[in-house]
Amino acid sequence: MSNQWWDEWAEKCHSKAHRQLLFWRYLVKQTLLLVEDDKNLADGLLVSLEQAGYDCLHAETIADVKQHWDKADLVILDRQLPDGDSVQHLMDWKKIKDIPVILLTALVTVKDKVTGLDAGANDYLTKPFAEAELFARIRAQLRSPDSGQDDSKVVTSNLTIDKATREVFFNGESITLTRTEFDLLLFLASNLGRVFTRDELLDHVWGYNHFPTTRTVDTHVLQLRQKLPGLEIETLRGVGYKMKA
């Protein structure tokens, strides 16, 4: 893509929402550090996290954590590691880089939770756990104003959109979309439950209002439904579209 073409296109994108879409494409992909010595659990969780669009690092011991810490945007941290209790080192690690930490542990008492949170953890999830809950907690921490992280992905129960790489995963499978299909999907998924008229979608996604026909929106919605079967984009007759939460 030439710089001249990009500049001309960006000038047409007068709406704030569409300028944000352009900016999102340059955000850095988020990296998670999983600190877990249970090989089976770690292997399965790493696969799921990568399918959700995250880059992943893995450490099995306290000794391995320090070399990875400054590369991560969030840490999923087991407490009971082969070389000790990880929370005893948490304050020191956070001095290297203050990033969100989710403790994922079999220690379940109130005292255990208080100890972990007082040591600097941002969240505490006990084993056994549901992946969906862990992923929701990850998303919550990464979009928190206190995390200092860019929210470079849109994630729902079955959909992951990476704004930086323009990759889309639906039900764990990679989906190839055109540029406009991607922009439309990203906009709707970023505004779950909100209703938009066809003219509003033309403005936000295409970047200008004067387009030959609003049927263009209908065509692209149809293409998204065909490429992502089961995607819940609802048609409100006589009004427009919304994506269900």
UniProtKB/Swiss-Prot annotation:
Gene3D superfamilies: 3.40.50.2300, 6.10.250.690, Winged helix-like DNA-binding domain superfamily/Winged helix DNA-binding domain
Effect of inactivating the gene: Mutants lacking this gene display a significant colonization defect in an infant mouse intestine colonization assay and mediate less E.coli killing. Mutants show a decrease in vpsL expression and altered levels of cyclic di-GMP, and are deficient in biofilm formation. Mutant does not show any in vitro growth defect.
Keywords: Activator, Cytoplasm, DNA-binding, Phosphoprotein, Transcription, Transcription regulation, Two-component regulatory system
Positions of the Response regulatory domain: 31-142
GO cellular component, one term: cytosol
Residue ranges of the annotated DNA-binding region, renumbered to this chain: 151-245
UniProt PTM: Phosphorylated by VxrA.
A Pfam cross-reference name: Response_reg
Function: Member of the two-component regulatory system VxrB/VxrA involved in the regulation of diverses processes, including virulence, the type VI secretion system (T6SS) and biofilm formation. VxrB positively regulates the expression of the T6SS, a virulence nanomachine that directly translocates effectors into bacterial or host cells, thereby facilitating colonization by competing with sister cells and intestinal microbiota. In addition, it activates vpsL expression and biofilm formation, and represses motility.
Organism: Vibrio cholerae serotype O1 (strain ATCC 39315 / El Tor Inaba N16961)
GO annotation, biological process: regulation of DNA-templated transcription
PANTHER family assigned to the protein according to its UniProt record, in alphabetical order: DNA-BINDING DUAL MASTER TRANSCRIPTIONAL REGULATOR RPAA (PTHR48111:SF21), REGULATOR OF RPOS (PTHR48111)
Positions of post-translational 4-aspartylphosphate modification: D78
Molecular function per GO: phosphorelay response regulator activity; transcription cis-regulatory region binding
SUPFAM superfamilies hit by this protein: C-terminal effector domain of the bipartite response regulators (SSF46894), CheY-like (SSF52172)
Impact noted for substituting D78E: Constitutively active. Does not significantly impair colonization
Highest taxon of the lineage: Bacteria
Protein name: Transcriptional regulatory protein VxrB
